[in-house]
Design a protein with these regions (language model features):
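PLP-dependent aminotransferase-like
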Residues: 111-170
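PLP-dependent aminotransferase class I/II
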Residues: 54, 226-302, 306-309
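Conserved PLP-binding catalytic core of the aspartate aminotransferase-like
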Residues: 303-332
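N-terminal "arm"/small-domain region of PLP-dependent enzymes with the aminotransferase-like
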Residues: 14-70, 86
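Short acidic capping loops at alpha-helix termini that bridge into adjacent secondary structure
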Residues: 91-95, 117-118, 164, 203, ...
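N-terminal secretory signal peptides and thylakoid transit peptides that target proteins
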Residues: 1-21
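Phosphate-binding glycine-rich loop
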Residues: 79-118, 136
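Active-site pre-lysine segment of PLP-dependent enzymes
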Residues: 154-163, 176-199, 203-236
Length: 334
């Protein structure tokens, strides 16, 4: 992989391209062929999982329809919350369940905005919380430039934290670059910065990471640091359309976050998520197929001499060599 390119070139002449898990098959695990997939263009920007939901999750959801005439969401919600707590070695009071991780992001922006503080975020990252914070909450979002390697600059971010800062948003692995941060540097940053403001670490692509050096920041919650972690059932579990996500943080932050939740979850989605998080076989398959698909794409890029960043996710950030304003309409033609 070539690396001798400038940050300006990457930002001005790059696009995110999915290296999706588009390979076929194992009995019971085949790419979905719904009408939307057949009639609509390939939606590369959503990083969807073509294999999910698993058969186990689908059976659980079909069964859940028998209780859909009742207000049974609370029982399912409690069960899912307890499961997530168990899987992550935290207590149920450390967990909040959201209508996808997007609700977690939005409610965190509300929480930050009500306090009247600033939000610090990298210039190249997942924009949901930044857009909601600036447009809906009128929050001042302070942007931190990327490093020369298109990485998140933790040192500069730490230097920009001041008395006005209420929250720092970091995505690890980052979207759209697919890269992870140095675990020791991230842990140090979280420990030091959380003494001054909440550190929000978006781990939406957590399950896809193959780098053995990677480390989730969930363990810091048990140590009492004001760190907020978000994750989603939309990627590895293939439940994007059912909107299930969760947050892990201190009981104080979780309690406040829950006070802004809309209560939009449904029993079918929750039952599907419960079954899927217990279905280790499908998770393993989903991750393996993603790795195979990503390797096919990177091998092709290497063969063609196309520059890209090493990805730990189900998408790849490449240098197209074409201005993004020309690249997008060109893609629409295909």
């Amino acid at each position: 992989m070539k690396k001798n390119i400038s940050r300006r070139e990457w930002i001005n002449k790059s696009a995110t391209v999915i290296g999706g898990s588009f390979l076929g098959s194992m009995i019971g695990f085949s790419p979905l062929k719904g009408a939307s997939l057949l009639k609509e263009p390939v939606r590369m920007m959503y990083n969807e999982n073509p294999y999910g939901p698993s058969d186990v999750a689908r059976r659980a959801m079909r069964k859940a329809f028998s209780e859909s005439n009742l207000y049974t969401m609370r029982a399912a919600l409690s069960e899912f919350k307890n499961l997530i707590a168990e899987l992550n070695n935290v207590k149920p009071e450390n967990v909040a369940i959201g209508f996808g991780s997007r609700e977690i992001l939005n409610k965190a922006a509300i929480m930050n905005g009500i306090d009247g503080g600033e939000l610090i975020s990298p210039t190249l990252t997942f924009e949901a919380i930044n857009q909601f914070a600036s447009k809906t909450m009128k929050t001042n979002v302070v942007r931190v430039p990327m490093t020369k390697e298109i990485g998140i600059d933790l040192k500069t971010t730490g230097q920009m934290v001041n008395s006005k800062t209420n929250m720092v948003y970091l995505c690890n692995p980052n979207n759209p670059t697919g890269a992870i941060m140095n675990p020791k540097e991230l842990e140090f940053f979280c420990k030091e910065t959380s003494k001054k403001s909440i550190v929000f670490v978006d781990e939406a692509y957590h399950e896809y990471v193959m780098d053995k050096k990677y480390r989730s920041m969930v363990s810091l919650v048990n140590e009492g640091y004001d760190v907020l972690i978000s994750r989603t059932a939309s990627k590895v579990h293939g439940l994007a359309g059912l909107r299930v996500g969760y947050a892990i943080s201190t009981p104080k932050i979780i309690k406040r976050l829950n006070s802004y939740m809309n209560g939009s979850l449904n029993v079918v989605g929750l039952r599907g998520a419960i079954a899927s998080y217990k279905d280790k076989r499908f998770q393993k398959f989903s991750i393996e197929k993603n790795n195979e698909g990503r390797t096919i794409v990177t091998d092709y890029l290497d063969k063609k001499g196309i520059e890209y960043l090493e990805s730990q996710t189900n998408f790849i950030f490449i240098k197209t060599g074409i201005d993004i304003k020309k690249f997008q309409p060109a893609m629409e033609k295909h």
